[in-house]
C-alpha cells in the first residue's frame, strides 16, 4: 500500500523524523528533502527490479531468436525525420540464430490516418501504391495481428510476449537480458523513431513486448568487424552478395538483413542487444557491450 504523501509542515517533519532525517528548515526546504528522499527510494526500487529480472554473466540468457523488422513510412522528399512519418508497411521475420534460418514471417501493409494520401516521392521510393494502403488495416489492428503472430511462437520465445516485463532504464542498462529473443533492425530508426512516433501519434500505450533492448544491426556490424558504418548493400558486399528484391520495400529489406545475420552467425558472432528505446525521443545505447564501439578515424 502506497504511503500518503505528507502535505503540512508538521506531517513532513514527522515523516522525516521517522526516517532519521533532519527536520530543520522551512516548508519548502522540508518538501525538497522529502522529494529527494522519494526520488532515491524510487531509484532503489527500480534497481531492485533490475536485479530481479537481470542475470549473472555465468547464467546469462543468450539470444536464440531475432525478430527482424524493417518498416516503411510516409515521407516527403527533403523532409527526413522531421516529417510526421506514419508506418505503411510492417514486416517481421522470426530468425533462429542457431539454425541460421527464418522460422516464420509476418507482413502487413498499414493504412495511415493523419496523411492518408501518399506523396509521389513516397510511392516512387517504396513502390507502395495508394490502393494498397487504402485497403490495409490501421496500425492498432496490425499491431494486434503481430502480437497474435508472436504469441503463436510462445513455445520458443522465452519469456513469451504475454509474460515479458521491461523495466525502464536508469543510468545504465544491464548488457545481459533475461530473454532469448530480441527485436533487430537496420539502425535505430525503425524502433526508436518510426514505431515510437506511431505510438505517439495514435496515443497508444507501448506494450512491453515491443519496447526495451534491441539489436541495431548496422551499428553491431560496424563494431564486430571494426569498419565504418554502412547500409544494407554495404554489409552485403562484405561477403560479395547482392541485394535481392526491391530496395526500400520493408519485406525485402528485412529478408536481406536476415542474410547478413546468417553470414555473421556462420562466423560465430554472438548477437546481443546494443540499443534500447522506451518511447519517442527516449532511447539510448546499452553500455559494456561484448563488441566495443568502433569509431572510424
Curated annotation (Swiss-Prot):
InterPro entries in the cross-refs? 3-5_Exoribonuclease (IPR051274), ERI-1_3'hExo-like (IPR047201), Exonuclease_RNaseT/DNA_pol3 (IPR013520), RNaseH-like_sf (IPR012337), RNaseH_sf (IPR036397), SAP_dom (IPR003034)
Q: Where does Mg(2+) 1 bind?
A: 70, 72, 253
Q: Domain of life, per the record?
A: Eukaryota
Domain (Exonuclease) spans 68-153
Subcellular location field? Cytoplasm
E.C. designation(s): 3.1.-.-
Q: Which top EC class is named for this enzyme in its record? A: hydrolase
Residues reported in the UniProt entry to bind Mg(2+) 2: 70, 190
Q: Where in this chain does the record put each SAP domain?
A: 4-38
Residues that bind AMP, according to the entry? 72-73, 248
Reply yes or no: does the keyword Signal apply: no
Question: What does the entry comment about cofactor binding?
Answer: Binds 2 magnesium ions per subunit.
* Any one GO biological process: regulatory ncRNA-mediated gene silencing
Residue intervals passing through the bilayer: none
Quote the cellular component terms of the Gene Ontology held in the record. cytoplasm; cytosol; nucleus
Q: What does this protein do?
A: RNA exonuclease that acts as a negative regulator of RNA interference (RNAi). Acts by degrading the 3'-overhangs of double-stranded short interfering RNAs (siRNAs). Represses the accumulation of heterochromatic siRNAs leading to negative regulation of the RNAi-mediated heterochromoatin assembly. Also involved in rRNA biogenesis, trimming the 5.8S ribosomal RNA (rRNA) from a slightly longer pre-5.8S RNA in the cytoplasm.
The protein's name is 3'-5' exonuclease eri1
Q: In which organism is this protein found?
A: Schizosaccharomyces pombe (strain 972 / ATCC 24843)
Amino acid at each position: 500500500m502506497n504511503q500518503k504523501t505528507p502535505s503540512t509542515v508538521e506531517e513532513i517533519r514527522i515523516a522525516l523524523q521517522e526516517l532519521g532525517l533532519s527536520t530543520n528548515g522551512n516548508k519548502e526546504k522540508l518538501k525538497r528533502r522529502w522529494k529527494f528522499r522519494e526520488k532515491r527510494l524510487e531509484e532503489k526500487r527500480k534497481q531492485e527490479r533490475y536485479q530481479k529480472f537481470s542475470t549473472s554473466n555465468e547464467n546469462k540468457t543468450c539470444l536464440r531468436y531475432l525478430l527482424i523488422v524493417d518498416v516503411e513510412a510516409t515521407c516527403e522528399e527533403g523532409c527526413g525525420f522531421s516529417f510526421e512519418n506514419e508506418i505503411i508497411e510492417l514486416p517481421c521475420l522470426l530468425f533462429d540464430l542457431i539454425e541460421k534460418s527464418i522460422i516464420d514471417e509476418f507482413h502487413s501493409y498499414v493504412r495511415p490516418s493523419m496523411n492518408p494520401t501518399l506523396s509521389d516521392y513516397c510511392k516512387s521510393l517504396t513502390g507502395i501504391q495508394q490502393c494498397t494502403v487504402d485497403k490495409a488495416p490501421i496500425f492498432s489492428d496490425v499491431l494486434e495481428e503481430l502480437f497474435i503472430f508472436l504469441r503463436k511462437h510462445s513455445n520458443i520465445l522465452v519469456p513469451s510476449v504475454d509474460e515479458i516485463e521491461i523495466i525502464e532504464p536508469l543510468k545504465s542498462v544491464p548488457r545481459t537480458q533475461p530473454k532469448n529473443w530480441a527485436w533487430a533492425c537496420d539502425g535505430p530508426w525503425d524502433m526508436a523513431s518510426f514505431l515510437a512516433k506511431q505510438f505517439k501519434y495514435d496515443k497508444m500505450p507501448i506494450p512491453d513486448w515491443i519496447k526495451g533492448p534491441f539489436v541495431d544491426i548496422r551499428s553491431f556490424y560496424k563494431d564486430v568487424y571494426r569498419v565504418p558504418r554502412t547500409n544494407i548493400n554495404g554489409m552485403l558486399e562484405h561477403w560479395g552478395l547482392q541485394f535481392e528484391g526491391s530496395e526500400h520495400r520493408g519485406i525485402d529489406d528485412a529478408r536481406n538483413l536476415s542474410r547478413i545475420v546468417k553470414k555473421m552467425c556462420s562466423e560465430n558472432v554472438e548477437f546481443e542487444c546494443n540499443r534500447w528505446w522506451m518511447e519517442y525521443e527516449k532511447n539510448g545505447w546499452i553500455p559494456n557491450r561484448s563488441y566495443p564501439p568502433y569509431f572510424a578515424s
